[in-house]
Design a protein with these regions (language model features):
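Non-catalytic, alpha-helical, charged scaffold/linker segments
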Residues: 176-182
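Membrane-interface alpha helices of multi-pass inner-membrane proteins
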Residues: 141-173
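Transmembrane-helix signature of polytopic, membrane-embedded enzymes
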Residues: 78-104
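Transmembrane signal-anchor helices characteristic of membrane glycosylation enzymes that use polyprenol
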Residues: 1-15, 19-26, 182
Length: 182
């Protein structure tokens, strides 16, 4: 029933209102092969929306989804900035300029405005890049449990993100990435 509410009004090419549907009426609206944990990640949002809907008598899904998307985009920006400052060691002006330049790309601007999992993936991947950069800078390696936790969370949002976490582990750990202890 909710698909009929969101689908005629949601016109962004390449995006669909699946997050709105899942938060409004919790179900496995995402393909669980590609997004194994995403339905469970949005479950607390469904609980919050159900409580707010019962309290106010209207569907508050736009507000409930907007808060985590805004937080994820803000922290993705902060991680881009910190990568530029702490890992690449740029000056403050240059780091700010490059961070703003990254967010000026149309695809990034559109992704942080739509209610989809792209912003959450971007936040998690920027965190992975930042953490990997710091580990390389301080000549440390990923431990197996750090990689496993990072893989579980990022691959839970989108399975292809897990491959990127493994690549970061390969670049950080080098040859020791292939050891059985890792």
């Amino acid at each position: 029933p909710y698909w009929k509410v969101f689908e005629p009004e949601f016109h962004l090419s390449g995006y669909d209102p699946l997050t709105y549907l899942g938060v409004t009426d919790w179900d496995f609206v995402y393909n669980v092969v590609r997004h194994p944990l995403l339905a469970f990640i949005i479950w607390p949002l469904w609980l919050l929306n159900a409580g707010l809907s019962a309290l106010f008598g209207v569907n508050c899904v736009q507000y409930v989804v907007a808060v985590p998307v805004m937080l994820a985009s803000f922290y993705a920006y902060l991680f881009i900035y910190r990568i530029n400052r702490d890992v690449i060691r740029l000056q403050q002006y240059d780091a700010t300029l490059l961070s703003a330049f990254y967010f000026s790309f149309a695809y990034i601007m559109l992704s942080v405005l739509v209610p989809d999992h792209f912003t959450i993936s971007m936040f998690l991947l920027m965190f992975t890049l930042y953490l990997s950069g710091l580990l390389i800078r301080f000549n440390r390696e990923f431990t197996w449990y750090e990689s496993a936790l990072l893989f579980l969370i990022t691959a839970g949002v989108t399975l292809s993100n897990g491959i990127k976490v493994f690549f970061s582990g390969l670049f950080v750990n080098g040859k020791s990435f292939f050891r059985p202890t890792y």
